[in-house]
């Protein structure tokens, strides 16, 4: 008794699992019933993996399970329904890649319990065929146009006219879905639902039905159906816009823009829950956007629209012919009953007046076609046996198989009775049969080899996709080592970029110095020391970051440069200005070369010295070099003017004080 009670509780928990998960999503806080219903049914669709199955796969499953041969009012048991659902999901897993397989047993349990709760509330354990078709066709994935075409085919007669009784039955079954997710008060079935969809039309064809169902807005009782499809389309749409209420940086799904408040936009969660801020009110009209357009695209569209370049909007669906399409002729799958006696053929040939040799030639020419039909029949029968995953105990299926076997046996018996043919025909037919058997054997061998190769490749793929325990144990170590290597690489790259930047600054300063020296050296022969008509050399702009020049470090190694410059200018007019400049230039060049070598030889010492100087408030070595070059070229440029030796000595005193 205790075990039975535990099993009952487990069964009830499985039946209520989908509804418990749906309540956990808190869809009831959505204030609009249409969006609330569409969100709930979309959750059921995705949770049961029905969004992966389109309407064409559903039709194939109906035919495989023989539902297309049953009347709509026929009732099937829950076990038969479970067989149909199982075939749907097993075929789905065959189409999906190995990395995207679904849990078939869980999907079967969830969908079966949901369908029983929605369509068998009385607990009779039976559902009608039309209920199963209506529910699965409505909840499956795919295009809405294809769904509506299939639904119309189930409600129309042979002339393509919709029967209002069938439409009423479809609405009754379809509106059980909102009722199953506790939205019956908003979208429950009423007796006037049919007339609300088609109030005046008397004859409804396919195109009229599609126009009504896909209109904007659709019929009130089915307004949740197109919204559920639009939810599926915009789930992954990204809007780079900030929500005006929750201030999230971007939106996913629908975007709502107020038509009264300037640039007031809400994400779908805030709009559905009725959130508002500032001067905005829930009574304001909102426009729903299912895509994002950049301002450039909006501007181009507005210009094209104003110029009349926008193409006309395409119709929501193509126009289908009024007359329904004729069903496919599948008579070749079950061949006609063969003749029991070949005398009928002989009589027909003799009555037509054809001579006997011509009759024999025609029979010999028809033999390959007959053999091809036989082999095609065998191949189709074997394919059907291999394709059927489950054997259904349906009387129609068994009768069809018995009829097929009987006709094939009759054909074999008829061929066995044709042993009275001439020897030439028998030998020719024997050779043809032998060649056909050899060809069949070769094709079977090739098919067997191909199947073995496919199986081998599938096993290799599965083994490669499943990591071994040793690899799983080594993976953390490899990942840690890879992380350390990447961190070390980043540090080295930062170090290299810093060194390159420092080297680039020094090279720029050296290039400027050499250009100034060359310009001064080339301009000296044409400029007399006593002539004041020459233009002074442009002075470089002084950086505000250059403070007082430090009196230690690299400054000591440059003290000789200042001495050479002072010595070069101390002689006044007694020495040639050109020689003085050359001596000063050589001294500066040698000093700068030694400074560059010193900078490159002690990278770590420079960083430490730079840190100490930064703490003491002193500028780095590059700043000192800039100040030194600035003052040096100030003195060199001042030599071209008619300054007295007294002014130059004052300038030297100022230089020494600055240094």
From Swiss-Prot:
Keyword Nucleus among UniProt keywords:
yes
Instruction: Consult the record and explain the modifications the protein receives after translation.
Output: Phosphorylated by PKA. Phosphorylation at Thr-11 alters the interaction with KIF5A.
A UniProt-annotated Pfam family: EF-hand_2
Which residues carry the post-translational modification Phosphoserine, per the record? 394
The modified positions for Phosphothreonine read: 11, 69, 179, 212, 424
Q: Tell me where in this chain the PTM N-acetylmethionine is found.
A: 1
Q: Note the InterPro entries from the entry.
A: Distrobrevin, EF-hand-dom_pair, EF-hand_dom_typ1, EF-hand_dom_typ2, KCMF1/Dystrophin, Znf_ZZ, Znf_ZZ_sf
Which residues constitute the signal peptide according to the record? none
Report the subcellular localization. Answer: Cytoplasm; Postsynaptic density; Cell projection, Dendrite; Basal cell membrane
Coiled-coil features, chain-numbered ranges: 429-519
Recorded GO terms, molecular function?
DNA binding; zinc ion binding
Tell me the tissue specificity.
Expressed mainly in liver and lung. Expressed in brain, namely in neurons of the cortex and hippocampus and in the dendrites, soma, and nuclei of pyramidal neurons of the hippocampus region CA1. Expressed in kidney, namely in epithelial cells of renal tubules, collecting ducts, Bowman's capsules and glomeruli. Expressed in blood vessels and pia.
Question: Where Zn(2+) 2 is bound, by residue?
Answer: 258, 261, 280, 284
Q: List residues traversing the bilayer.
A: none
Q: Where is this region: Syntrophin-binding region?
A: 369-418
Q: Where are the zinc fingers (ZZ-type)?
A: 238-294
Q: Where does Zn(2+) 1 bind?
A: 243, 246, 267, 270
**Effect of disrupting the coding gene:** Homozygous knockout mice for Dtnb are viable and fertile, and are normal in appearance. Double knockout mice for DTNA and DTNB genes have a mild myopathy plus synaptic defects and abnormal motor behavior.
Annotated region described as Disordered, given as residue ranges: 520-562, 599-620
Subunit comment for this entry? Answer: Interacts with dystrophin short form DP71 and syntrophins SNTG1 and SNTG2. Binds DTNBP1. Forms a specific complex composed of DMD, SNTB2 and SNTA1 in neuron; the interaction with SNTB2 and SNTA1 is DMD independent. Interacts with UTRN and dystrophin short form DP71 in the kidney and liver. Interacts with SNTB1, SNTB2 and SNTA1 in kidney and liver. Interacts with KIF5A. Interacts with HMG20A and HMG20B. Interacts with OLFM1. Interacts with PRKAR2B and PRKAR1A.
The text the record gives for the protein's domains is:
The coiled coil domain may mediate the interaction with dystrophin.
- Protein name from the UniProt record: Dystrobrevin beta
Q: Which gene encodes it?
A: Dtnb
